[in-house]
């Protein structure tokens, strides 16, 4: 199935297979908290994504309705009671735990409201670049982090690549990179295989919601020095 993104928003700029996978994992509760929050905002902005998410949620609900109850054997029930009584929980690592959703940061409709995000408290990193942290620690070497990034109109970002994945949702303004223009409502997906230097569109500061798995990898020595201080 493919999604046709025809709406007042600009066309979605990452491969549809990536979007479909993200939405399906969102509907199934398989996304990490930061990814979950970002996709939730994208769904609020884009009616096509919202429709696809609703479809996947309905399919999941239908599958659950078709599950037939199975009687449990006394032996199984006894084993469960024994575990509860003597405090030996099953420590099974599960990256697909639906409880991730419960732990996700609250996604306010304010994040997709231009006036609200422009009037948030921002921490200046360098002239023309500011950040508003939402989840995680940008200065740690590893670990998912979610933040709002605001960059002045017309500014060119330093050339960089990534450690792991970066998901970005444009909330205001836009930028150009690799021959493409990303504007409000667009999702942009990057990883360590690509190096780029986005240029912010003229006329309006660019604000995006960004999820990264680790700090950016700057290509030049001066941005590297600055990064050690400000973190991003």
PLM regions and their residue ranges:
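Glycine- and acidic-residue-biased ligand/ion/polar-headgroup-sensing regions
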Residues: 152-155, 161-177
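Ligand-binding loop in jelly-roll beta-barrel domains
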Residues: 194-218
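Alpha-helical membrane-targeting segments
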Residues: 218-232
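Conserved short histidine dyad/triad with adjacent acidic residue
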Residues: 117, 130-162, 189-195
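Short alpha-helical interface segments
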Residues: 2-14, 20-28, 33, 37-106
């Amino acid at each position: 199935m493919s999604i046709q993104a025809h709406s007042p928003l600009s066309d979605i700029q990452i491969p549809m297979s990536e979007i479909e996978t993200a939405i399906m994992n969102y509907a199934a509760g398989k996304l990490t908290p930061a990814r979950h929050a970002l996709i939730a905002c994208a769904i609020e902005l884009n009616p096509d994504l919202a429709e696809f998410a609703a479809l996947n949620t309905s399919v999941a609900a239908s599958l659950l309705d078709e599950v037939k109850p199975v009687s449990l054997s006394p032996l199984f029930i006894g084993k469960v009671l024994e575990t509860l009584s003597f405090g030996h929980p099953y420590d099974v690592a599960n990256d697909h735990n639906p409880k991730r959703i419960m732990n996700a940061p609250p996604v306010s409709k304010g994040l997709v409201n231009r006036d609200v995000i422009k009037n948030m408290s921002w921490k200046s990193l360098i002239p023309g670049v500011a950040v508003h942290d939402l989840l995680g620690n940008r200065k740690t070497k590893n670990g998912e982090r979610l933040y709002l990034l605001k960059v002045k109109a017309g500014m060119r970002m330093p050339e960089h690549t990534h450690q792991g994945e970066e998901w970005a949702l444009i909330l205001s303004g836009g930028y150009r990179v690799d021959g493409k223009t990303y504007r409000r409502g667009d999702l942009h997906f990057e990883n360590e295989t690509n190096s780029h230097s986005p240029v912010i569109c003229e006329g309006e500061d660019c604000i995006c919601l960004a999820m990264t798995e680790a700090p950016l990898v700057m290509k030049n020595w001066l941005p590297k020095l600055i990064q050690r201080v400000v973190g991003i």
